[in-house]
């Protein structure tokens, strides 16, 4: 049995002009970024489409006041991304902020897009993790 496929490194890149996501220099998907509301361009929302432009994933920057177990606000702000699967309406959550490359890597390294569509098995695993 060959283990060549397992040893291969996955190099994910995003072209700044076109938004094309490549894995080992092979185009896989397109990343569209837009400013998250109220963030003055600092944080972004990300849509990932297949190469034909069909929307597959939407990562939304979210902030909300943190509350304690009694429901009182602690004065801190929770910052996270809501990770939405458009077709299935599946939803995950990742704490913190994310760059365009980070959004591309989370989709590609989890094998979410296969032949231009969301892979259902990869989606199930992903939603267990996030």
Briefly describe each language-model feature range:
Residues 8-130:
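Cysteine-centric segments in proteins
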